[in-house]
Amino acid sequence: MAEGNKGVGPILRMSDDIDGIIQAIRDDNPDKEIRVIDRHAYVRIEGDPPLLLTRASIENELGRDYPLREIELLMSSFNGVMDSSNSDQFIWTRKNI
């Protein structure tokens, strides 16, 4: 992550799917450093914008269908601006897309 640059990304409540979601974010952003801050009850996941998360990557990691609305139920908050207009992906950035 760039020095002095606050990352963007989801803040998720702890669940059985967290490890798969984290790996899916890493898979979707292979050239970015992904920082994970575990606060026991929740996990903050962040990287330099834009940060992408696709349904295909989550399904690949978890081995099952995974509608993105399930992420919305886990997401207590997020850093940055989140574009959820596509049912197959989320993008976090600093500006409106």
Give names to the regions the model predicted:
Residues 1-22, 28, 41-61:
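Conserved N-terminal glycine/acidic-rich loop preference
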Residues 39-42, 46-97:
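Helix-rich interaction surfaces within compact, conserved domain-sized segments
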Residues 31-36:
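A short linear hydrophobic-aromatic micro-motif
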Residues 21-29, 69-75:
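Short, solvent-exposed secondary-structure boundary motifs
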